Each structure stands twice: as C-alpha cells, then as structure tokens.
Amino acid sequence: MMPVRTYHHHHHHNNSNNHRLRRIIPRVLLAVFAIYAVSFAAYLLRHQSPHPHPHPAADPERDAVDAAGGGGGGGAVDRVRVEAPSSQKPWPRLPSFLPWTSASVRPPPKHSCEGYFGNGFSRLVDVLPARGGGGGGWFRCHHSETLRSSICEGGRVRLDPGLIAMSRGGEPLDQVMGRAEEEELPKYEPGALQVEAAAKRTGPLVEAGFLDAYVPTGGIGMHTMRSLLDSGRVVPPGELHCSQWVEEPTLLVTRFEYANLFHTITDWYSAYVSSRVTDLPNRPNVVFVDGHCKAQLEQTWEALFSNVTYVKNFSGPVCFRHAILSPLGYETALFKGLSESFSCEGASAESLREKPDHQKTARLSEFGEMILASFDLLRDDILSSKTSNGLNVLFVRREDYLAHPRHSGKVESRLSNEKEVYDAIEGWAKGQKCKINVINGLFAHMNMKEQLRAIQEASVVIGAHGAGLTHLVSATPDTKVLEIISSMYRRPHFALISHWKSLEYHAINLPGSYARVTDVINELSNILKGFGC
C-alpha cells in the first residue's frame, strides 16, 4: 500500500507547486513589464522635445527657468526640467508657401528675383561658434550679397534696457505729442548686447571690419542694427547676469516710420523672412527695440507674431535662449526696389513648384497670405463668394487722422478732387448693366481685419498714390489695380508691388493733382470689360 500512498502524496505536492507557479509567473511578468514601462517612460521624458529646437547647441543645459522668464539662473531653480510644449502660435498653412531652408533647395543666384525676396541669405558667418560638448552661447549671421544685409541670431544673448538711451515706448499718442523722432530711436552704450562664450573669452562681439562687410550702413543715416552689434560684448561662462530669461525664440526689431503702412509692411516682411531663414518652428515673439508710442498697426504685429513687447518694459537685463536680429525695413526688396533695378515678376507658387525660375517669385503672395491667415481670412468661403454679389470696386481714400507725435492730423492731398472722383464713380456704377459695388475705403477709420477683407473681396482697387495701397500684397491674383498718380508723387511703389504679385496694373498720370472724372471712368470701364462687364 505504501507505494500507492507515496504516489498520491507526490501527486498532491506537484499540484500545489504548479498552482503556486501559476500564481507567481503572472506576477513576475507584471513586475518585469512595470519596470520596463517605468524605465521607458523615464527615457521618453528625458528625451522629450515638443518640436526640434533649430539649434540644439544653443543651450544644452536647459537651466530650470520659468518659460515666462522668472529667475536669474541661480540657486534652487538650477534643476533639469522637462521642456514644456511651445506656447507660441504655430505657422499657418499657406497655399503659396515654398521651402526656405532645406538640403534640396540650392541658394538662389546673386541679384536674382528669389535672391531679393526669398532666402538669398546664403553666406553663413560664425561669429561665436557653438561648442560641440554644449555650454555657453553662440552667435552667427546669415549674409545676403544681393540685399547687402544680414540676419543675425544667437543663443544666451543678453539685452540691457539700462544701456539703451531712448523713450520708454508704448505710451498713448496724446501723452507724447511733439516728441522728436530721435528720442524714440535707440542709442546703445557698450555692453547693451552681451553673448555668453563657451570659454573664457571677452571683448567686442564683432570688429569694425565685420560690420563693414556684413552690416554696411548702405546710405541709412541711423543703422540701428549695426549700432546694436557694435555695442556687443562677449562675456565668460557664468557672467551673463539676467533679471529675466525668455525661453522662446524672439525677434529684436527696430521700426522706422512705424505709423506708415508701407514702411510697416517692409518691417513685417523683414521679420517674416528672418523667422523663415532661421528656420523657427513656430511664430516668434517680438521685442521692439525702439521707443515709439502706441499706434494702430501694433495690433497687426500682435496678430502676426506670438507676443509683442517693448524692450523698456523689461525691469532689468533680459536674456534670450534664442534671439534673432531682424534687418531694417529699408533693407528689404520692397524698399530697395524703389532705387535698384532688378528683373523680377510675380508667379504662382504652383507654377514655380513645377518649373523653378529664379527670376520669378511667389514670396509676396506667401507673405500676403500670412497676413490674411493671422486674421483668419485665408478661408475658401471668402474667396469662392468673391463675385457672387457683383464686382467690388474698392476706392482707397486718403483722409485726415492723427498718426504720430510729429503729425498735424492733416494728410497731404495726392488727388485734390478725390471726393468728386469717388462720387462720380459711384453714380456711374449705378447705371451699369452688371452689378458694381463701389466700396468707400476709409482705411484710417477701419480696423485691420476690415481693411484686409475689403482688399480681398475687391475685383478692382483704385486710389491715389498712398501707403494704403500697400495692402495689395494681400490681394487675390485676379485683382486689377488703377493708380491715380499726381505729378508730385510719381514713384513706383505700387506699380512694382503689382508686378511682383503679377496683378494687372493701370495708371493715370496727372499733370498736377486734379483728375478729370471722364478719364478715370473711361479707364475703369475698360478694366471692368476684362471681367465681362
């Protein structure tokens, strides 16, 4: 009987072992899986980045500094942190967008159309190279031989408002009437700009020879970007004393003629190009390094970019993880085209994708779309309904309004009988077979979204030579232009913009500033025939 009992006992023992194993194995597997999951999560957190930083060497240590800017990088806050997703606005999808930087895109030839409007900033000059092992700042410039200007950028860059002599900026207009323009433009003391070196290097950031080669004055009386670079100093590691850190990429911009739409659009274009050439993943912040008072156009800066402030609003020295110095508006193709002759015409991005041509450009259309998208106007429903209710003839008016502290509130008349011409067109339109809506473009009394919508919906834009016509950068490709030009203002601004946008352009050149109503109506009538009217 014993063998039988032994057999039964052994069988029972095996059963209990199997039972225990069946309980233990899942637990072991679960524990192994949990350890693996935790270590994988830790790995992800350690390597997480919401978007590729364009310059990984800019600041590898990533000091634990609040994204809003608090802390001077000392004491308890110096701990490694997980980078938060960007708070900056993403780039909108633009139908006319063409790549600015990519291995497959070769730099455009010097003095070509794309060299003027696109990424002709093809010469990279390393002023302060980033250290391979990390640590320290960096500084470099992208130079355009075509425009004879540079877009400069750096990491661990300090700007000290206390070393910039100018007005505070951003004040209400009525508080600063009569203030001289010189007071509003920056004068820098040495060290106003500082960049932290990776090694114990000190001294000027750049020499005079560098400035002459890469940031020449080019006939600009007060070249503030050159002056800012001239004030630049390199400081050793740990010597960059900051009251505040700005984590996000930031454009440093100095505006001239900031209340004038034409000059402001040159500033917007320069800021847009600077953002694309430096390959920013999102729309940057903007710091105005000027002391101009509040102006209506500031709202459009805020719509185009992520955040806008004045440098004098910072309470002390402010440091940037990534700062970009945007060239002056005077250095853009929009301005240089007034005095330099170059072959360039507008084309659709679609045609340039199929057949690249450096003597054609879609960049102004891309930029116009950027402005529209910033006001949520780049919508198919707006474009598809453009002519559903008749043809819009937009008459861009010049009217009196107080623009800046040195302004009388009166605008020079470029068309002495503007009201007579407007009334005559309105009367004539009512008698036509096809439906023509004459739109009274009192732009100085319309907000930017209303102005852009009026331009977008216009089949014909008509007006005396004046800054309001610069909105043509946002016109749709089928828009036709009629400019009435007095003998005192025979300048090519809007003929050129129309050409660079490939818009059909017509002009009436007046012997003085008085237009014969019949001449204007005859010209307008001929233009409308092109719409089958």
Swiss-Prot record:
Supply one GO CC term from the record.
Answer: Golgi membrane
**What broad taxonomic lineage does this protein's source fall under?**
Eukaryota, Viridiplantae, Streptophyta, Embryophyta, Tracheophyta
Where expressed (tissue)?
Expressed at the base of the crown roots and in the basal region of the shoot, which contains the shoot and axillary meristems.
**One Pfam family in the UniProt entry:** Glyco_transf_61
Query: Which residue ranges are assigned to the Cytoplasmic compartment in the record's topology?
Result: 1-23
The biased composition feature labelled Basic and acidic residues covers 56-65
Q: Which InterPro entries match?
A: Glyco_transf_61_cat (IPR049625), Glycosyltransferase_61 (IPR007657)
Print the keywords alphabetically.
Glycoprotein, Glycosyltransferase, Golgi apparatus, Membrane, Signal-anchor, Stress response, Transferase, Transmembrane, Transmembrane helix
Glycosylation positions?
A: N307, N313
An individual GO BP term: shoot system development
Q: Which residues lie on this side of the membrane: Lumenal?
A: 45-533
Disruption phenotype annotation: Reduced number of tillers and reduced biomass.
Q: Which enzyme class, named as a word?
A: transferase
The annotated pathway is: Glycan metabolism
| Keyword Transmembrane helix set for record | yes
Homology family: Belongs to the glycosyltransferase 61 family.
What is the protein's known function? Glycosyltransferase involved in the xylosylation of N-glycans. Possesses beta-1,2-xylosyltransferase activity, transferring xylose from UDP-xylose to the core beta-linked mannose of N-glycans. Beta-1,2-linked xylose residues on N-glycans are critical for seed germination and plant development and growth under conditions of abiotic stress.
| Catalytic activity, EC | 2.4.2.-
- What are the transmembrane regions? 24-44
Task: Name it.
Answer: Beta-1,2-xylosyltransferase RCN11
Signal peptide limits: none
Concerning what turns on (or off) its expression, the entry says: Induced by osmotic stress (mannitol), abscisic acid (ABA), jasmonate (JA), cytokinin (BPA) and brassinosteroid.
The gene name reads RCN11
Q: Where in the cell is it found?
A: Golgi apparatus membrane
In alphabetical order, the GO MF annotations are: glycoprotein 2-beta-D-xylosyltransferase activity; UDP-xylosyltransferase activity
Q: Does the keyword Metal-binding apply?
A: no
Q: Where are the annotated segments for Disordered?
A: 51-78
Q: How does it sit in the membrane?
A: Single-pass type II membrane protein
